[in-house]
A protein has these predicted regions:
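Conserved beta-alpha
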Residues: 8-88, 92
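Short, flexible loop segments at boundaries between secondary-structure elements
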Residues: 71-77, 119-155
Length: 180
């Protein structure tokens, strides 16, 4: 599920015509709205964000099954701590593990744990903060034009400048120079 426009365009050009952009926050709401019996686990965000997120989700989606919520520390976990976190996630019986650590940390975490975690892991970046009410999403017209990144950059330039302008430029350069 490509969350960014460049990835969806690249995917469609390389044999995946159905690869339309689906943002993590939008996917969350779509799946929460369905009363399908899925158990949801939330990994990431601050304790306050998770508390507010849980409150808002329980109000809006009373049928939603929350299997667990964990705010990991902002440091690397020891091997023992990591094993305990994975055991907690797996013991919860979660079907979907929403990972809100931000890019690229959440992608690295999911890659490192793909053979350990039972359930589908989905990286949602700032999705927890959006749905908890901590930060506002871009206006709908910007979302539809795939300019949400620009809105976020204007809101938090110090933190996002490197990610959006340096890293994304490098990605575009690599995709254009890759030989098929």
């Amino acid at each position: 599920l490509p969350d960014g426009k460049p990835i969806s365009v690249y995917s469609r050009k390389h044999g995946f015509p159905e690869a339309e952009r689906v943002t993590g926050p939008d996917l969350m709401l779509e799946l929460f709205a369905r009363d399908n019996g899925l158990r949801h686990y939330f990994y990431g965000g601050s304790p306050e964000t998770l508390q507010m997120l849980e409150q808002k989700l329980r109000e809006r989606y009373p049928h939603l099954q929350i299997a667990g919520m964990v705010s990991p520390p902002f440091r690397s976990l020891s091997a023992e701590e990591d094993a305990a976190e994975i055991e907690k996630i797996n013991a919860s019986g979660a079907d979907i593990i929403w990972v809100g650590l931000g890019a690229p940390k959440q992608e690295n975490w999911m890659y490192d744990h793909m053979d350990k975690v039972r359930g589908v892991m989905i990286g949602v970046g700032a999705g927890f903060d959006y749905h908890a009410g901590n930060i506002k999403r871009a206006p709908m017209w910007m979302q539809k034009l795939s300019l949400e990144w620009l809105y976020r950059l204007m809101q938090d330039p110090k933190r996002l400048f490197k990610r959006y302008l340096v890293t994304n430029t490098r990605y575009l350069w690599l995709t254009r120079t890759k030989r098929q």
